């Protein structure tokens, strides 16, 4: 068995004396693990940084074996992240969430495209939080938790939408909320793709996407806690408000 494709490095861990096991995200093969022989060596270890874009060749005797990777660097994203606390926190959040959420060896091409685009924006501090928010919405969509924000779930109206139902992920208008308003999640305009995305609105939107990541996605994955890297990114972002 063999395939070759570019992918994004999600994580690496030592395996034996000199090898490493890496997890990558690729367009056609999804989240995929494999052994890199010599992965802890001075030559290869610097290549295996989270977020790195790699040219990957995977080989195994049988399809269900872990197999091994040959890796070649395409581009590193470490430099953009290391000089910027927000970028580093964001990179860690993206790779941790993908490792947490993605089923093994299942393609999610639209999410891959959005992930590559997002990581290529690392270091662009003014636009990156909004790009990350849109990526979280895409992540929820691809994992089966799409938000439906075009019309009120109660009245059907398409204006004055200011809440999200924590159960259904559907928008709710001020009129439709009634006495339930204090139990609903915020729906800032930026979450509907309206406006330029001021930081205060993005912070509100993170409350809503974070709820669905924690209370729906993570719970359905056996109740495992969401990776702390996501909370650290939101906290780092909130410091600039």
Swiss-Prot record:
Gene3D superfamilies with a match to the protein in the record: Nucleic acid-binding proteins, Recombination protein O, C-terminal domain
Gene, per the UniProt record: recO
Recorded family membership: Belongs to the RecO family.
GO cellular component: bacterial nucleoid
NCBIfam families (alphabetical): reco (TIGR00613)
Species in which this protein is naturally found: Roseobacter denitrificans (strain ATCC 33942 / OCh 114)
One Gene Ontology biological process: double-strand break repair
Full protein name: DNA repair protein RecO
Lineage of the species this protein comes from: Bacteria, Pseudomonadati, Pseudomonadota, Alphaproteobacteria, Rhodobacterales
Keywords for this protein: DNA damage, DNA recombination, DNA repair
Described function: Involved in DNA repair and RecF pathway recombination.
Domain of life: Bacteria
Transmembrane segments: none
């Amino acid at each position: 068995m063999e395939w070759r494709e570019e992918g994004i490095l999600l994580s690496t861990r030592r395996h034996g004396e000199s090898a490493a096991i890496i997890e990558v995200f690729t367009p056609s093969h999804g989240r995929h693990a494999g052994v890199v022989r010599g992965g802890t060596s001075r030559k290869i270890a610097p290549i295996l940084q989270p977020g790195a874009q790699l040219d990957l060749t995977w080989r195994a005797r049988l399809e269900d074996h872990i197999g091994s990777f040959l890796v070649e660097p395409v581009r590193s994203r470490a430099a953009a992240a290391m000089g910027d606390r927000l970028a580093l926190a964001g990179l860690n959040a993206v790779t941790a969430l993908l490792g947490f959420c993605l089923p093994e060896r299942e393609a999610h091409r639209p999410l891959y495209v959005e992930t590559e685009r997002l990581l290529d924006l690392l270091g662009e501090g003014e636009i990156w939080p909004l790009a990350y928010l849109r990526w979280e919405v895409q992540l929820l969509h691809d994992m089966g938790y799409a938000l439906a924000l075009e019309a009120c779930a109660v009245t059907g109206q398409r204006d004055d939408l200011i809440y999200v139902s924590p159960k259904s992920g559907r928008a709710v208008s001020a009129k439709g909320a009634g006495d339930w308003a204090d139990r609903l999640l915020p729906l800032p305009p930026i979450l509907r793709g309206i406006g330029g995305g001021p930081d205060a609105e993005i912070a509100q939107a993170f409350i809503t996407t974070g709820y669905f990541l924690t209370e729906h996605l993570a719970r359905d994955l056996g109740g495992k806690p969401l990776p702390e890297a996501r909370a650290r990114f939101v906290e780092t972002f909130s410091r600039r408000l």
